[in-house]
């Protein structure tokens, strides 16, 4: 009697989901896996001990086309959500801090600009963020409110052609190294987001030190003290 043998079990894919992936998705997964093996794993121990992540890694990740890879236009790769998830899974296997840099950059900072930003803001920031030339962060979580917008204490008020921003955010990935922050604040018209470039008067992003986890990730406070934000 003829018998057939089952395909070998892969510990990382025991549900055999690989069969449902496209060739492009497999290629992206395998390319990111190789990147992690050569550019992350040999160094992540030192990054953990030093509690740092080299700035030039963002440029390498940009060359890998994983920054904002699920977005279309403005230099973004425009891949499927599945491909993006596979890339993040491979990055996470190397280190959570590296994956955090990528997912905060793409899913939070870049997506917010891509979805709600003006055309000028998109053209200014997204191409540079896709290459890793510019880094973004996402300021929602607060010391007393957590990530609940309904309890948000950060406020912004109109001042001529711009806004004045006051309040503090906490546990913000990429904050200290960010070239632009997407900061959410309560206004008289409701909660809205603001793009706050590095060097904005009254705005600072001190790093949080002595973490027990996610050490190879820059985690920061965001502090607005009458920060002058353009409209």
Q: How would you describe each model-predicted region?
A:
Residues 132-140:
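A short, Trp-centered hydrophobic/proline-enriched beta-strand micro-motif
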Residues 146-148, 163, 172:
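Hydrophobic, small-residue-rich alpha-helical packing segments that form membrane-like cores
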Residues 19-39, 43:
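Mature N-terminal segment immediately following signal peptide/propeptide cleavage
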Residues 153, 166-206:
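A short core secondary-structure module
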Residues 151, 199-228:
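Flexible, small-/acidic-enriched active-site or ligand-binding loops
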Residues 42-64:
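Short secondary-structure junction/hinge motifs that connect adjacent elements
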Residues 62-133, 173-180:
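Internal helix-loop-helix
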Residues 1-24, 156:
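Intrinsic disorder at enzyme termini
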């Amino acid at each position: 009697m003829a018998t057939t043998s089952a395909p070998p079990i892969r510990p990382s894919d025991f549900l055999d989901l690989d069969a449902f992936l496209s060739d492009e998705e497999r290629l992206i997964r395998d390319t990111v896996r190789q990147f992690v093996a050569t550019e992350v794993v040999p160094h992540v121990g030192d990054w953990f001990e030093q509690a740092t992540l080299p700035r030039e890694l963002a440029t390498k990740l940009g060359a890998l086309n994983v920054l904002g890879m699920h977005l279309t236009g403005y230099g973004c790769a425009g891949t499927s959500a599945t491909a993006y998830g596979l890339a993040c899974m491979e990055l996470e296997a190397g280190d959570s801090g590296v994956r955090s840099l990528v997912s905060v950059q793409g899913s939070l900072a870049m997506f917010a600009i891509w979805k709600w930003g003006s055309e000028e803001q998109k053209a200014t920031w997204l191409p540079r963020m896709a290459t890793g030339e510019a880094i973004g962060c996402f300021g929602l979580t607060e010391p007393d409110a957590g990530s609940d917008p309904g309890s948000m204490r950060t406020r912004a008020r109109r001042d001529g052609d711009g806004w004045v921003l006051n309040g503090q955010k906490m546990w913000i990935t990429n904050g200290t190294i960010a070239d632009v922050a997407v900061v959410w604040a309560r206004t008289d018209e409701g909660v809205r987001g603001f793009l706050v470039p590095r060097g904005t008067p009254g705005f600072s992003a001190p790093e949080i030190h002595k973490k027990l986890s996610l050490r190879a990730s820059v985690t920061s406070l965001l502090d607005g003290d009458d920060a002058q934000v353009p409209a």
